[in-house]
Amino acid sequence: MACPSCRAPLRASVVTIIDAAQHPELKARLIAGQLNMAMCPSCGMAIMISAPLFYHDAAKQLAFVHFPQQLNARQDEQERFIGDATALIMRALPPNAPRGYLLAPRRFLTLNSLIDAVLEADGVSREKIEAHRQRVDLIGRLAEAAERGDEALAALVDQHRDAINDEFFAAIDAFIAASRQVGRDDSAQLLLALR
């Protein structure tokens, strides 16, 4: 794989199946938007790697699938991936575990809609999901303002002072931890400075 910015070669691990019970850390990375991210060692650009994803949670009987549109995967390729993922998961389940829900996984057009469904299954309301998205957006805008200078940052902080609360700082802390986990120390440092 080559960096789209500087064309330097890079290596990255790609996750295509998440079993929430066996790998809760992958579920956390998915929810934080850090799944299948790579960092170019040459220019430092963060790269989102497009890959199909099969999400499974046996306790909640969830089977979700997402194919990024940019993959242009044919229907037969999608069905083959889903069949292979389903077979792999079924073999890992205990003999008496329910399996019917795996035969018709719910498909999602966007990764964000899949993440929303995971959060809803965890009991997170639509309102909380939207509030989280707004916090994430604000964090991104504050990071951009910080790069432009102290004046731009101060103006944006004043404008959104009521949104900068404990939940906001918890979101920043989660992003710092996720950034460190995937080796994005520059991003973690920027967020620490922002905090």
Predicted regions and their residues:
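Short metal-coordination and nucleic-acid-contact micro-motifs, chiefly zinc-binding Cys/His arrays
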Residues: 1, 8, 33-36
